[in-house]
């Protein structure tokens, strides 16, 4: 007897850039500042582009990220350049993208379904949600979802909500426990070397 199985396929061409995430080798201290030994072994990503793609104008300011991992966590850091550093959302799970924000999308099985979305602003306000399917396929986020064990920090080189200040950038550090991502992993474990 044969059984037909439907496997989700992305509705748009899908060829994201590749980043090799190295294993962390040094002790970590969460403070939002990425100018420290922990991040020295992590290369920067390419500069971020508009979410709509490379056909859009280049961003006015540079944003780049770094990532590392160990047996328990995925570590993400980013530097967001800018001469005005704005943030107003202060309530968890508010619509953070109304402010300048940093966003992370994690899809443990790489099928573009059952993935986690994370956003944070310069005030260290977090919005984390789960999506069973992408927005483009009619999905909507589960706003009440909270990523257990998530830790975040922000460092500001300048002043928040003061355009007259000498603002340079803000940086973020995000610690995502692998255990928080197990629900939709085929194997409920942290990645092994070569998988991440």
What would you call each of these model-derived segments?
Residues 1-196:
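Structural preference for beta-rich elements and adjacent junctions enriched in aromatics
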């Amino acid at each position: 007897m044969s059984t037909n199985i439907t496997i989700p396929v992305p509705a748009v061409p899908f060829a994201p850039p590749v980043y090799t995430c190295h294993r962390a080798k040094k002790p970590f201290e969460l403070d939002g500042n990425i100018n420290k030994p922990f991040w020295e072994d992590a290369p920067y990503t390419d500069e971020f582009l508009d979410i709509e793609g490379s056909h859009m104008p280049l961003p006015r300011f540079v944003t780049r990220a770094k990532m590392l991992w160990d047996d328990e966590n995925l570590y993400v850091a980013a530097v967001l350049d800018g001469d005005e550093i704005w943030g107003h959302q202060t309530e968890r799970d508010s619509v953070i993208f109304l402010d300048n924000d940093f966003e992370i999308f994690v899809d443990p099985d790489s099928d573009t379904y059952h993935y986690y979305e994370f956003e944070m602003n310069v005030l260290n306000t977090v919005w984390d949600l789960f999506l069973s399917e992408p927005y483009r396929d009619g999905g909507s986020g589960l706003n009440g979802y909270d990523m257990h064990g998530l830790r975040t920090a922000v460092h500001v080189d300048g002043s928040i909500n003061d355009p007259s200040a000498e603002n340079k950038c803000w940086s973020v550090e995000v610690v995502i426990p692998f255990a928080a991502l197990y629900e939709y992993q085929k194997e409920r474990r942290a990645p092994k070397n070569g998988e991440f």
